[in-house]
Amino acid sequence: VYSELEQGASFKVYLPRYVGTSETTDVESRQNMKPARGSETILLVEDESAIRRLLTELLKYSGFTILQADNGVEALQVADQHAGPIHLLITDIVMPQMSGRVLAEQLIVRRPDMKVLYISGYEANAIVHQGILDEGAPFLPKPFSNDALLKKIHKLLNLPPEPDS
């Protein structure tokens, strides 16, 4: 740490170099990804626009039809306007206007066959402990890899696993 009065401070952190072998990066994983075999429709509800755009791109590339909304109120409107089935709701848990849990509860009444996957930047234990989500509910903590998301989706929708490249 180096500091000068009215000039600020600088911090230098030295980390050891990683000498192991690297795993496949998300970019490499995405390049090798095979599209899903089905034509399922997913309603993606995420209040962070950058995350919503990235997930939409990934899921479309993987063969899914994507409906999207940036909050629960908008998601209810999108779902009501969509005549076909919605196979999966992927929703952030903590959002303005309406939580992901309340959204899911309302949509399941209208679409009882729809599956739900909750995503959040909060840890699963904290969410369950606070009563925000029931223990055992399908949940994926952020950040997550493309592969982890696709595996979870395939499991929830009973799709065959993504082929390995």
Which residues fall in each region the model found?
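C-terminal end segment of the histidine kinase catalytic
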Residues: 1-42, 49, 73, 115-118, ...
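Acidic catalytic/metal-coordinating carboxylates
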Residues: 71-74, 99-103
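Two-component His->Asp phosphorelay active-site signatures
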Residues: 47-49, 145
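Active-site residues of response regulator receiver
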Residues: 92
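Acidic, metal-coordinating helix/loop segments flanking the phosphotransfer/catalytic sites
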Residues: 56, 68-88
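Alpha4 helix (beta4-alpha4-beta5 surface) of REC/receiver domains from two-component response regulators
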Residues: 102, 106-141, 146-155
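Receiver (REC) domain active-site loop signature in two-component systems and cognate sites
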Residues: 95
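Charged docking surfaces used in two-component/phosphorelay signaling
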Residues: 53-61
